[in-house]
Regions:
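Conserved active-site regions of diverse hydrolases
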Residues: 3-4, 13, 18, 23-333
């Protein structure tokens, strides 16, 4: 039985993650392969648009943030695991704006996987594969759903279809021989600046509904995949679980503002490292460092360790200081 399935059972189906911290920590990764959207894009959309999207600066070298994204920071905690940036042979197929489906431009996540395998790409037992997506499906579906007679009934198929895409991608990667897959669910979308204020506020409940619908279906899909692919460790990093904690008490994580966007489309705030959000939906460099630390904890400690680390301020601070020190030059801090 896969670790994801055991972890979900032990947590009474509340969270899918590795169940044995020691086993997770012992895993060695030689390469990182990334499929996803703007939260993982390290400059791919910027390159294909001739350096026009996103506008850099103020965006950082084609990232949808003011610094490196979390997948570039994995592995900077010395002694944990080998995947990270820079890592020889690592591959990033993520594109800003990508949905989970087979859209042509920017390449949807199904197409990202097809492009990788079509070019002869393979997966190995020591690969760490990061898969994160679904938000763009929901963002693009909310306007029409919100204007319909049944907003929840209209957005639910969008969320469920995105989760089905994710299941397909994860299952395909596992069947192709990947040793470990880190799948990230969606945070509580209603707490992002795009939906927690201004014109987007009325859509906040619908965004939350869509996100939880997606997350529930994603978990079910991952459990089924875990049962069918016993040789792959499938780990779900639960961003939703920490959303309210982050919003309610950002100081625990070294932040002062988890509500507003640092960059409002015209001006940049004076203290971006104290903000969780860079723009309406994307994390700041500080936010990405936080996600990277959380990912490290999930990969090394498993669910229980990750949960305790997030909620334990002292333990969190020790790891935060270590990671910040090792990534300062990369992030320009």
């Amino acid at each position: 039985m896969s670790r994801l399935l055991r972890g979900a059972a032990l947590a009474a189906l509340t969270l899918a993650a590795v169940s044995t911290a020691g086993a997770a920590g012992a895993q060695s990764y030689n390469r990182l392969v990334v499929f996803g959207d703007s939260l993982s894009d390290n400059g791919n959309l910027y390159a294909v648009t001739g350096g026009t999207t996103p506008t850099s600066p103020p965006y950082y070298q084609g990232r949808f943030s003011n610094g490196p994204v979390f997948t570039e920071l994995l592995g900077f905690n010395v002694g944990r695991y080998a995947a990270g940036a820079p890592v020889t042979g690592s591959i990033n197929y993520a594109f800003g704006g990508a949905r989970t489906d087979s859209q042509a431009s920017p390449p949807g996540m199904r197409n990202q996987l097809l492009a990788y395998t079509g070019a002869g790409g393979k997966f190995g037992a020591n690969d760490l594969v990061s898969i994160l997506g679904g938000a763009n499906n929901i963002f693009q579906g909310i306007p029409a759903a919100g204007a319909s007679a049944n907003p929840q009934g209209s957005i639910a198929p969008v969320a469920l279809s995105a989760a089905a895409d994710m299941k397909f991608i994860v299952n395909s990667v596992a069947a192709a021989g990947a040793g470990t897959i880190l799948v990230t669910n969606l945070p509580r979308l209603g707490t992002t600046p795009q939906f927690n204020q201004g014109a987007g506020l009325p859509a906040s409940p619908l965004a939350d509904y869509a996100g939880t619908t997606f997350n529930g279906a994603l978990l079910s899909g991952l459990m089924a995949t875990a049962a069918a692919q016993p040789n792959t460790n499938i780990i779900m990093m639960d961003l939703y679980k920490i959303s309210d904690t982050l919003s309610g008490n950002p100081g625990l994580f070294g932040l002062t503002n988890a509500k507003d966007a640092c960059f409002n489309g015209a001006t940049v705030c004076s203290t971006p490292d104290s903000y969780l959000y860079w723009d309406g939906v994307h994390p700041t460099a500080a936010g990405h460092r936080l996600i990277a630390r959380l990912a490290n904890d999930y990969l090394y400690y498993g669910d229980l360790g990750a949960q305790n680390a997030v909620l334990g301020e002292t333990a969190w601070r020790h790891r935060e200081d270590a990671l910040d020190g090792s990534t300062a030059s990369l992030s320009g801090r």
